[in-house]
């Protein structure tokens, strides 16, 4: 192995370069592929257990919590989220550094970027909590993790869109403008899916309707899975 002097410039050179876009795509695909695998396996091998409801009405699709609580689905989901979570923490730190550079002389935006960073950490912690504590193990902890994840995710998206609206206000970069509009559309889409999920959840628990209501809730929740890309 070649020895490099301590004060040499070569010591500060990066060992590995990974394009940010590639890192973001890989980070997003991990939970998406894991979720699809869990749902497919649950429907093929554990259909009755995955689609069971408390009021025992017929159902067609499993919820995320039901799909990832079975075996081996839970291990697939935990593996994909374990690989997925580390880059999310790195991306959150990278965005914080980026915001501080863009808003170096603006206190309000600095505080908002710090709050956005905390929301990103909270979102990731909630995701890990609901992942590694399944609904069949400790339901209250799993439920708290799910609420923490969804709530932090939505507020994180909202704050991110606000910061980027300020960035594009004083920018002529077409790439930054496209990134802002992409983030805004994803926020509106994800927020709409969460609203529908809450509506169908309350309706299902109130009226215990067969099949379609619970299935619609499951589809809505699927779109609330951790696929908020770092665009």
Swiss-Prot record:
It is an enzyme of class 2 (transferase). GO terms for cellular component: endoplasmic reticulum membrane; Golgi membrane. It is a multi-pass membrane protein. Coiled coil: none annotated. The keyword Disulfide bond does not apply. Its main location: Golgi. The chain crosses the membrane at residues 23-43, 79-99, 111-131, 147-167, 180-200. Residues 44-78, 132-146, 201-231 are lumenal. InterPro entries: Frag1/DRAM/Sfk1 (IPR019402), PGAP2 (IPR039545). Keywords: Golgi apparatus, GPI-anchor biosynthesis, Membrane, Transferase, Transmembrane, Transmembrane helix. It is found in: Golgi apparatus membrane. It comes from the Eukaryota. Pfam families: Frag1. Residues 1-22, 100-110, 168-179 are cytoplasmic. GO terms for biological process: GPI anchor biosynthetic process. Its EC number is 2.3.-.-. The keyword Membrane applies. Belongs to the PGAP2 family. Involved in the fatty acid remodeling steps of GPI-anchor maturation where the unsaturated acyl chain at sn-2 of inositol phosphate is replaced by a saturated stearoyl chain. May catalyze the second step of the fatty acid remodeling, by reacylating a lyso-GPI intermediate at sn-2 of inositol phosphate by a saturated chain. The fatty acid remodeling steps is critical for the integration of GPI-APs into lipid rafts. PANTHER family: FGF RECEPTOR ACTIVATING PROTEIN 1, POST-GPI ATTACHMENT TO PROTEINS FACTOR 2. This is Acyltransferase PGAP2. The gene is pgap2.
């Amino acid at each position: 192995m070649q020895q490099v002097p301590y004060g040499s410039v070569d010591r500060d050179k990066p060992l590995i370069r990974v394009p940010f876009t590639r890192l973001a795509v890989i980070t997003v695909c991990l939970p998406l592929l894991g979720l699809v695998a869990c749902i497919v396996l649950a429907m093929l091998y554990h259909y009755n257990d995955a689609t069971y409801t408390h009021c025992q009405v017929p159902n067609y699709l499993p919820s995320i919590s039901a799909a990832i609580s079975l075996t081996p689905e839970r291990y697939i989901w935990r593996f994909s989220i374990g690989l997925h979570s580390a880059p999310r923490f790195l991306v959150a730190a990278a965005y914080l550094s980026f915001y501080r550079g863009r808003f170096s002389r603006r206190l309000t935006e600095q505080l908002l970027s710090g709050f956005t960073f905390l929301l990103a950490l909270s979102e990731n912690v909630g995701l890990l909590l609901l992942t590694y504590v399944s609904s069949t193990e400790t339901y209250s902890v799993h439920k708290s993790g799910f609420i923490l994840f969804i709530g932090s995710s939505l507020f994180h998206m909202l704050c991110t869109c606000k910061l980027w609206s300020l960035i594009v206000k004083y920018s002529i970069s077409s790439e930054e403008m496209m990134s802002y509009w992409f983030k805004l559309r994803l926020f509106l889409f994800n927020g709409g899916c969460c609203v529908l999920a809450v509506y169908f959840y309350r309706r299902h628990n109130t009226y215990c309707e067969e099949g379609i209501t619970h299935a619609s809730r499951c589809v809505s929740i699927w779109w609330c899975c951790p696929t908020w890309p770092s665009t």
